[in-house]
A protein has these predicted regions:
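A conserved pocket-lining segment of Rossmann-fold NAD(P)-dependent short-chain dehydrogenase/reductase
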Residues: 87-88, 149, 193-206, 214-238
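Glycine-rich NAD(P)-binding loop of the Rossmann-fold in SDR/ketoreductase-type enzymes
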Residues: 89, 93-104, 150, 154, ...
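Glycine/proline-rich active-site loop of Rossmann-fold NAD(P)-dependent oxidoreductases
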Residues: 161, 185, 197-213, 240-241, ...
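NAD(P)H-binding glycine-rich loop region in Rossmannoid oxidoreductase-like domains
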Residues: 61-97
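Active-site Tyr-X1-5-Lys
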Residues: 133-136, 151-189
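Conserved Rossmann-fold NAD(P)-dependent oxidoreductase catalytic core, especially the SDR/UDP-sugar
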Residues: 103-155
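N-terminal Rossmann NAD(P)H-binding glycine-rich loop of SDR-like oxidoreductase domains
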Residues: 12-32
């Protein structure tokens, strides 16, 4: 890896760069140009993004944090996380990764913002897991706003909600310096609550919302698939390009246009049964059954069927490029067919 952007205007840190969101974000930042991209992950960089990165920090973020104090980052995209299902198995480890890692990066951004009198932007992908509700509430809630049902049922959701609050604190109230006669420059924290994200170019990683893409990958390969949630289970989803679009739109917008720190974004909502129907339409020989796993079902049942993203639409012009039909017809299915030779 070399310094491919020696005259770059922005120094950018992307943690969790080897994940689905991280790889897509690095590719888009490199495509835009003008960024010197530093990445961090516990895994080596995949070949797809190696030539787009100036430097990669390999290792556990919590233990590597001192290294980052030597860098002059303009923007931090903190994507590294222990996801929902894994976090339920290893709760203490999830808290260490999700909370301690986030807090240490927030402290870094706060320190650099104050010392060098230059605001560091801190972009944080939160999740619909930050919500928590009973199944009857889920069925009756309709479009859920950012300030509703904020009692998450999972460690991952608790971590995300708490980190949203930490971000607000470090942005506005850190050390109560906002009360000083001459307040210091503070970091600029911005968060998105993502729905289930689906990439056409990477394999599902076993996440709690991955039953939809897993179903279609199995159908394309002629493999049977037992879906781990009920047929009527419904949550919101988004194509990965729209996730990256929303993240960069929120990065670019002026702070004066933002009325909130945390924003919902949405694209379309589907039941598991509707995913099955799409799979059968494209792959008529698909063998799909429903065998709910009580724990994973319980997690998804605590998430809203859909969210209200009107704040994002109003404040910074958010609008997804992919609705449900264009997602399947123009984005996801063409790549699935290509991957498995079904053209």
């Amino acid at each position: 890896m070399t310094d491919i952007y020696p005259q770059a205007n922005n120094n950018v840190l992307v943690t969790g760069a080897c994940g689905e969101i991280g790889q897509a974000l690095v590719q888009e930042l490199a495509k835009r140009g003008g960024h010197r991209i530093v990445t961090a992950d516990i895994a080596p960089l995949p070949d797809a993004i190696k030539d787009k990165v100036a430097e990669h920090i390999l290792g556990d973020l919590v233990y590597k944090i001192k290294i980052f104090y030597d860098y002059d980052f303009d923007v931090i995209f903190h994507l590294a996380a222990s996801l929902s299902s894994k976090a339920e198995v290893a709760t203490e480890e999830a808290h260490r990764i999700n909370v301690e890692g986030t807090m240490q990066l927030l402290m870094l951004a706060a320190y650099r913002s104050e010392k060098y009198k230059k605001t560091v932007k801190f972009l944080f992908p939160s999740s619909i897991a930050a919500y928590g509700m009973s199944l009857p509430e889920k069925k009756s809630a309709g479009l859920v706003k950012e300030n509703e049902y904020s009692s998450p049922h999972t460690m991952y959701g608790c971590n995300k909600l708490y980190c949203e609050k930490l971000g607000m604190y470090y942005s506005h109230y850190y050390g109560q310096h906002h009360l000083d006669s001459h307040p210091p420059v503070m970091l600029d924290f911005r968060a998105l609550r993502f729905p289930g994200l689906i990439s056409a170019f990477t394999l599902p990683s076993g996440g709690t919302s991955d039953y939809g893409p897993e179903m279609l990958h199995a159908a394309a390969q002629g493999k049977p698939y037992a879906c781990f949630v009920r047929e009527d289970t419904k949550i919101s989803f988004m194509a990965m390009p729209d996730a990256i679009k929303s993240l960069l739109m929120l990065t670019d917008v002026s702070r004066k246009n933002l009325s909130h720190v945390v924003y919902n974004v949405a694209a379309f909502a589907l039941t598991a049964g509707e995913f099955r129907d799409r799979a059968l339409k494209s792959f008529p020989d698909a063998r799909i059954t429903f065998e709910p796993n009580p724990r994973r079902q319980g997690i998804v049942d605590s998430w809203p069927e859909d969210v209200d993203d009107s704040l994002a639409r109003h404040d910074w012009g958010w609008k997804p490029d992919y609705d449900v039909n264009s997602f399947f017809d123009n984005y996801f299915l063409p790549q699935i067919r290509k991957r498995y030779g079904k053209n």
